[in-house]
Amino acid sequence: MPEYQNIFTTVQVRAPAYPGVPLPKGSLPRIGKPIFSYWAGKIGDAQIGPIYLGFTGTLSIIFGFMAIFIIGFNMLASVDWNIIQFVKHFFWLGLEPPAPQYGLTIPPLSEGGWWLMAGFFLTMSILLWWVRTYKRAEALGMSQHLSWAFAAAIFFYLSLGFIRPVMMGSWAEAVPFGIFPHLDWTAAFSIRYGNLYYNPFHMLSIAFLYGSALLFAMHGATILAVSRFGGDREIDQITDRGTAAERAAIFWRWTMGFNASMESIHRWAWWCAVLTVITAGIGILLTGTVVENWYLWAIKHGVAPAYPEVVTAVDPYATATGVTQ
């Protein structure tokens, strides 16, 4: 009998194509016929399709493509419509927000209006996809853990691009679209406000980020390690602990001093992941609105040391008398 000894899926289970649960009356139909992919089966379910978008999903895709279209063509226009230069400099191209003098008004298209329009379409796309996530879970009788986790990520996105700029009174405070431009913005933002590493909510966000990465890795590794004992049947072992759950628990106690249960590990990971973006969003909203310089704030509250002033050397050639030559 095959055993799960590899970090990659070595056994693919092929069942007859399943179209999905019956749709409620009035729903849009599913699109396409189900197909099977060997390579998709290496990392997950081998069946692809049929796809159900529904009304909100279709609108989300349309708005998303409009945002990508606006951003892409503005990037292409910035290199004089040269496809070769577009590909060559793609990572450096961006769509910048309006200049500070425009405040929260609607600027001309060429001076930030396109950024505002792209941001609107992108935000609508994301919000509509959240509605789709909520409604699909509701239709399937599922709890809303995924939709609320997605909402936490949307809160962070809106904090950067909408809520904080409105609080600061200027769209110029928002993040540009583009790969390197948004990374440059992040570095400049941290320098401008006295180093974000001294922001306690940034500290919490990084702690939860590392924590969620560690928990997901530990959980995945543990379940793979006890899958030969039926550890992959986690739902069953939540209420009826078998040898896999017992072995996993005692291994955690031996190596960590405490252990999660088959149920609690998922809640730990969910909360760590959700709190990563919630604390990050709070830290962003406090920056510039409540705290102007995080380094000075850290010194005031005993988080960072107050470094003494260093005595500077005097250049004798810069003095009036000079020195003997």
Curated annotation (Swiss-Prot):
- Chief place where the protein resides: membrane
Q: Which residues bind Fe cation?
A: 219, 234, 266
Transmembrane residues, as ranges?
Answer: 53-79, 111-140, 143-168, 198-226
Does the record carry Transferase as a key word?
A: no
Residues annotated for a ubiquinone binding in this entry: 252
| Binding residues for (7R,8Z)-bacteriochlorophyll b | 182, 202
Question: What's this chain's function?
Answer: The reaction center is a membrane-bound complex that mediates the initial photochemical event in the electron transfer process of photosynthesis.
Q: Which family does it belong to?
A: Belongs to the reaction center PufL/M/PsbA/D family.
Protein's name in the database: Reaction center protein M chain
Species of the source:
Allochromatium vinosum (strain ATCC 17899 / DSM 180 / NBRC 103801 / NCIMB 10441 / D) (Chromatium vinosum)
The top of its lineage is: Bacteria, Pseudomonadati, Pseudomonadota, Gammaproteobacteria, Chromatiales
Q: Which gene encodes it?
A: pufM
